Design a protein with these regions (language model features):
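Short alpha-helical transmembrane segments in multi-pass integral membrane proteins
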Residues: 1-20, 78-143, 187-238
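Residue-level signal for short hydrophobic patches within transmembrane helices
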Residues: 13-32, 59, 63, 142
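Transmembrane alpha-helix boundary and packing residues in multipass membrane permease domains
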Residues: 23, 27, 39, 76, ...
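Generic alpha-helical transmembrane segments of integral inner-membrane proteins
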Residues: 24, 28, 32, 36, ...
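Interfacial/gating helices of multi-pass transporter permease domains
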Residues: 41-61, 127-132, 192-193, 236-238
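Small-residue-rich hydrophobic transmembrane alpha-helices
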Residues: 50-110, 147-166
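Alpha-helical transmembrane segments of multi-pass membrane transporters/permeases
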Residues: 101, 156-179, 193, 197-200
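Conserved small/polar residues in nucleotide/adenosyl-binding loops
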Residues: 239-246
Length: 251
């Protein structure tokens, strides 16, 4: 089966290095969304718009750290069952993890969107940039389902030993984000709202690439029949898997 790397055989050191390099690159690229937005906004709109994006960045880093860490943790049992060659159990974990992620994404999106204004007031956002900061942050909050979708699907792909494909997908999404920034901010004059829409679209694109790749090349991950059923024990294990990681990433 293509692009499945059995990391239980061969040199552990070599496999870890080969796996880790694209993984680290991927985390850097995910942070680049905000950096790219800030650079283009600051260059072509002005200081206030740049400050608005900057005011949102620390908030987004905190929330995205939690989301990313959770999704990475949910992929751990999937990787363990793949290594044990228990493929039916692996797919059952995939199904239950997707349910949990869907619930978390909806809840976090709803809560952050509703309290977006209060969050900005809590961090003492200046009045002259408040409107732009609100628009940018709200659009990023609304993109949380796409972000979590990418992270969980990328986690499943990495569970099979392939950290390169998710990295390539992030490169493509980052290029799309840059292109949309220029089109929406400069071409259409949409300001920070354009930057937020560009980021949301890029994250949705990365998620779609992961899903398409799994459908075409990694059907071993797709649950069928009884594997889709809700499982209390597996759900509890999935809930406990990400705890230390998501806390560390959201500090």
């Amino acid at each position: 089966m293509p692009n499945i790397n059995d990391m239980t055989v061969g040199s552990p050191t070599r496999d870890i290095i080969k796996f880790a390099v694209p993984l680290i690159g991927g985390y850097i690229l995910q942070q680049m969304y905000l950096i790219i937005d800030a650079a283009i906004v600051g260059q072509f709109i002005g200081v206030n718009a740049l400050a608005a994006v900057g005011a949102s960045s620390s908030i987004m880093f905190l929330i995205m750290g939690f989301c990313n860490g959770s999704c990475a943790g949910f992929a751990i049992p999937v990787a363990q069952e793949f290594g044990a060659k228990e493929y039916s159990k692996m797919r059952a974990y995939v199904a239950n993890a997707l349910r949990i992620v869907a619930v978390i994404a909806v809840v976090i999106t709803a809560v952050t969107a509703i309290f977006c204004e209060h969050i900005l007031k809590l961090v003492n956002t200046p009045d002259d940039i408040f409107h732009d900061a609100y628009l940018f942050l709200l659009l990023n909050f609304l993109a949380i389902p796409f972000t979590m979708s990418y992270n969980i699907l990328a986690g499943f792909i990495r569970s099979l030993g392939d950290s390169k494909q998710p990295f390539y997908f992030l490169i493509a999404a980052s290029l799309l984000n840059i292109a949309l920034d220029f089109i929406l901010i400069i071409g259409l004059g949409m300001g920070v709202e354009g930057a937020g829409i560009a980021t949301m679209t890029a994250q949705a694109f990365a998620s779609a690439l992961c899903w398409t790749y799994i459908r075409k090349h990694l059907r071993i991950l797709i649950p069928t029949g009884g594997e889709r059923a809700y499982d209390d024990k597996k759900t509890c294990l999935l809930y406990t898997s990400p705890s230390p990681r998501d806390r560390s990433l959201s500090r």
